[in-house]
């Protein structure tokens, strides 16, 4: 018998909540979502594993994460000396994703309750390890779908499955790849984290670009919003005011100081919402 095998078990005895089975004439514990459905002397297919107590068990609910396929695993424990332990659905066994397969900086590690997409790997000591999915694994594993039609500024959610040099890669709940550049996040994002962001573009290879920042209009302050509204409601979408305007002209128009005006205009320029040309402020087309 080997850890992680999918094999046939014969139920030998059912007593209270304990089910004993036989695999190659060796006793094993049999797990099932509903043991009342199990019958003595009947054969069932299941997933063979050593539980945390070193006992052989066969679970008749075969986990999606196996030696041949990828599945979701929920982080149960973080151990900075070894890695993170994820649950793949086994009642008394979590799978270790080694620190060798995790980011160098532990602040980028998954946290408890985060989710990873893993496949199992068995080493020469018959131990099971969790291996993280790549783009190719997600494609071949059937995680990708093109059913949903995304729109600009649509809010989407997903989990981070890979950290890159300039940003993070996400698998959206709708089954599409997404990318989050580091300039589009306000704080660190880690592996396995569930995030919700706004679509800001559509990149190469059918990958969606998202942002965790509020859109430009939501990020401007009250003074900037007042100036922007004033420009928008002029007939030709331009306002005869600029840095060269006098404090009195600015005060008469907006009731704010020139320094506040310059700060607000600078914010609007930085957000690419307006332009400043020939003494006029204009809505950027």
Feature-to-residue mapping (PLM):
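Single-stranded RNA-binding regions, centering on S1/OB-family and related RNA-binding modules
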Residues: 1-285
